[in-house]
Amino acid sequence: MAENPIWEQIGASFIQQYYQTFDADRTQLAVIYTDASCLTWEGQQYHGKAAIVEKLSLLPFQKIQHSITSQDHQPTPDSCIISMVVGQLKADDDPIMGFHQVFLLKNIQDAWVCTNDMFRLALHNFG
Protein backbone atom coordinates (compact mmCIF):
# COMPACT_ATOMS: atom_id res chain seq x y z
CA MET A 1 0.00 0.00 0.00
CA ALA A 2 1.32 3.45 -0.92
CA GLU A 3 2.25 5.88 1.82
CA ASN A 4 0.04 8.96 2.16
CA PRO A 5 1.44 12.17 0.64
CA ILE A 6 3.48 14.27 3.05
CA TRP A 7 0.80 16.99 3.29
CA GLU A 8 -1.74 14.40 4.45
CA GLN A 9 0.69 13.06 7.06
CA ILE A 10 1.44 16.57 8.35
CA GLY A 11 -2.23 17.59 8.28
CA ALA A 12 -3.44 14.45 10.07
CA SER A 13 -0.72 14.78 12.71
CA PHE A 14 -1.63 18.43 13.29
CA ILE A 15 -5.34 17.62 13.60
CA GLN A 16 -4.70 14.83 16.11
CA GLN A 17 -2.47 17.07 18.23
CA TYR A 18 -4.84 20.05 17.99
CA TYR A 19 -7.94 18.23 19.26
CA GLN A 20 -6.07 16.26 21.94
CA THR A 21 -4.68 19.55 23.26
CA PHE A 22 -8.01 21.37 22.92
CA ASP A 23 -9.83 18.64 24.86
CA ALA A 24 -7.18 18.46 27.61
CA ASP A 25 -6.20 22.14 28.08
CA ARG A 26 -7.04 24.56 25.29
CA THR A 27 -4.83 27.30 26.79
CA GLN A 28 -1.87 25.20 25.59
CA LEU A 29 -2.86 25.84 21.95
CA ALA A 30 -0.91 29.13 21.98
CA VAL A 31 2.11 27.33 20.54
CA ILE A 32 0.34 26.62 17.23
CA TYR A 33 -0.68 30.22 16.53
CA THR A 34 1.41 33.27 15.61
CA ASP A 35 0.90 36.97 16.21
CA ALA A 36 -0.38 37.17 12.62
CA SER A 37 -2.84 34.24 12.92
CA CYS A 38 -6.57 34.74 12.34
CA LEU A 39 -9.48 32.84 13.89
CA THR A 40 -13.11 33.05 12.83
CA TRP A 41 -15.26 31.43 15.53
CA GLU A 42 -18.96 31.28 14.71
CA GLY A 43 -18.61 34.41 12.56
CA GLN A 44 -16.57 36.43 15.07
CA GLN A 45 -13.02 37.40 14.04
CA TYR A 46 -9.95 37.29 16.28
CA HIS A 47 -6.46 38.37 15.20
CA GLY A 48 -3.20 37.34 16.81
CA LYS A 49 -2.12 34.63 19.21
CA ALA A 50 -3.20 36.49 22.38
CA ALA A 51 -6.73 37.24 21.14
CA ILE A 52 -7.20 33.69 19.84
CA VAL A 53 -6.05 32.03 23.05
CA GLU A 54 -8.20 34.41 25.10
CA LYS A 55 -11.27 33.49 23.02
CA LEU A 56 -10.60 29.76 23.30
CA SER A 57 -9.94 30.05 27.04
CA LEU A 58 -13.22 31.88 27.67
CA LEU A 59 -15.46 29.40 25.85
CA PRO A 60 -18.36 28.62 28.22
CA PHE A 61 -17.73 24.97 29.07
CA GLN A 62 -15.59 23.07 31.54
CA LYS A 63 -14.97 19.89 29.57
CA ILE A 64 -15.19 19.00 25.91
CA GLN A 65 -14.57 15.98 23.74
CA HIS A 66 -14.15 16.07 19.95
CA SER A 67 -14.73 13.09 17.66
CA ILE A 68 -13.42 13.45 14.11
CA THR A 69 -15.68 12.03 11.40
CA SER A 70 -13.49 12.96 8.43
CA GLN A 71 -10.56 15.15 7.49
CA ASP A 72 -9.13 16.26 4.18
CA HIS A 73 -5.80 17.92 3.45
CA GLN A 74 -4.41 19.63 0.35
CA PRO A 75 -1.14 21.35 -0.47
CA THR A 76 -1.40 24.99 -1.54
CA PRO A 77 0.71 26.65 -4.26
CA ASP A 78 2.65 28.61 -1.60
CA SER A 79 3.78 25.45 0.28
CA CYS A 80 1.08 25.62 2.95
CA ILE A 81 -1.46 22.93 3.83
CA ILE A 82 -5.20 23.48 4.04
CA SER A 83 -7.09 21.05 6.27
CA MET A 84 -10.85 20.60 6.60
CA VAL A 85 -12.35 18.71 9.53
CA VAL A 86 -15.90 17.45 10.04
CA GLY A 87 -16.81 15.98 13.38
CA GLN A 88 -18.90 15.99 16.51
CA LEU A 89 -18.28 17.51 19.92
CA LYS A 90 -19.75 17.12 23.36
CA ALA A 91 -19.35 19.99 25.82
CA ASP A 92 -20.26 19.46 29.49
CA ASP A 93 -23.79 17.98 29.61
CA ASP A 94 -24.93 19.56 26.34
CA PRO A 95 -26.20 17.38 23.49
CA ILE A 96 -23.69 16.15 20.92
CA MET A 97 -23.32 18.68 18.09
CA GLY A 98 -21.68 18.54 14.69
CA PHE A 99 -18.94 20.96 13.71
CA HIS A 100 -16.78 22.00 10.77
CA GLN A 101 -13.29 23.47 11.07
CA VAL A 102 -10.73 24.60 8.50
CA PHE A 103 -7.04 25.23 9.18
CA LEU A 104 -4.35 26.79 7.01
CA LEU A 105 -0.97 25.49 8.14
CA LYS A 106 2.37 27.08 7.33
CA ASN A 107 5.89 25.91 8.05
CA ILE A 108 7.76 28.66 9.90
CA GLN A 109 11.27 27.87 11.13
CA ASP A 110 10.72 24.10 10.84
CA ALA A 111 7.45 24.16 12.81
CA TRP A 112 3.93 23.88 11.38
CA VAL A 113 1.73 26.67 12.72
CA CYS A 114 -1.87 27.65 12.10
CA THR A 115 -2.15 30.96 10.26
CA ASN A 116 -5.91 30.72 9.68
CA ASP A 117 -8.59 28.83 11.60
CA MET A 118 -12.35 28.86 10.91
CA PHE A 119 -14.89 27.08 13.14
CA ARG A 120 -18.65 26.60 12.86
CA LEU A 121 -21.13 24.39 14.63
CA ALA A 122 -23.18 22.40 12.13
CA LEU A 123 -26.52 23.98 12.94
CA HIS A 124 -29.23 23.97 10.31
CA ASN A 125 -32.40 26.04 10.05
CA PHE A 126 -35.08 24.11 8.22
CA GLY A 127 -38.40 25.71 7.62
Swiss-Prot record:
Q: Name one GO cellular component term.
A: nuclear pore central transport channel
Q: Which UniProt keywords apply?
A: Cytoplasm, Protein transport, Transport
Q: Which InterPro entries match?
A: NTF2, NTF2-like_dom_sf, NTF2_dom, Nuclear_transport_factor_2_euk
Query: What CDD domains does the annotation carry?
Result: NTF2
Q: Which domain of life is it from?
A: Eukaryota
Residues covered by the NTF2 domain: 10-121
Task: From the Swiss-Prot or TrEMBL record, state where the protein is found.
Answer: Cytoplasm
State the protein's name.
Nuclear transport factor 2
Which species is the source of this protein? Xenopus laevis (African clawed frog)
Give the encoding gene's name: ntf2
